[in-house]
Amino acid sequence: MTSSGRSSAGRVLAAVTLLGLVGAGAVLGYATFRVWQRGNVDDAPRLAAADAIVVLGAAQYNGRPSPVLKARLDHAIALWRAGRAPFLVTTGGGQEGDLTTEAATGREYAIEQGVPASAILMEDRGRSTQESLEAVAAILEQRGAGATVFVSDRLHMLRVMRIAKDLRIDAYGSPATDSPSDATMARRLEATMHELAALAWYGLTGRPAPDQPAAAART
C-alpha cells in the first residue's frame, strides 16, 4: 500500500472512531437525561387513588433502617396517610449474616409510625430490584391490585418503572426527594453511573446485574 493509501485509510479509521465516540456519547447523554428526568416526575398527585404503595428496599442495620431506607419509608407513609392507597408493601431480603430483612425492618418502622400491621404486606426474599419487583407482581396479582405507586430514590425510579412495566404492573412512581443518595453532586453522579450500568445490563440480558445484591445496590 502506498503512503497516500495508508494516509487515506488512517483518515477513514479516525473518522469512524470519531463517529463511534460521538454516537456513544449521545446515547450516554440521552440515557443520563432519562434517568434524571424520570426522577423528577411524581405521579402520585394525579392519581385519585391507588391500590398499593410499594417501598423499594435499602440497607438496614440490625433492624434499624439506613438513612436512605428511612427516607423512602417516610415518603411512602406520608402517601398512605394522605389516603393514596390502603396498604403498603415493604420489600427486600437480607444479606448473609443479617439478623433481619429490609422488608421486616421497613414493616416495623411503619408500625412505629402508626401504620396498622394489617395495612402492611412484605416481600422479604428479593436480593435485587428485579427480584423484589417480580415477587411484588405476584403479591399484587393475588390481591387483585391495579394502580400501584412505587417509592424509591429519584435516580432509581427509571429502572424501577421500566421493570415494573415489563412485569405488566400498572405502575406509577413517587420518588423520595430528600434521600441522602441525592444530597450531593458526588452522590448523584455515583448513583447515576450505577443506574446507567444496571439499566444497560438489564436491557441486554433482562436480568439484574450479577454483582448487585439488594443491600449493596440500594444502600
What is the meaning of each model-derived region?
Residues 50, 209-219:
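Short linear elements at protein peripheries
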Residues 31-193:
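A structural signal for short, hydrophobic/glycine-enriched beta-strand patches
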Residues 1, 9-12, 89, 136, ...:
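Solvent-exposed, charged interface segments at domain starts and junctions
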Residues 7-8, 116, 184, 209:
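Serine/threonine-rich low-complexity intrinsically disordered regions
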Residues 185-211:
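A transmembrane-helix-recognition feature enriched in membrane-embedded lipid enzymes
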Residues 1-48, 217:
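N-terminal membrane-anchoring alpha-helices
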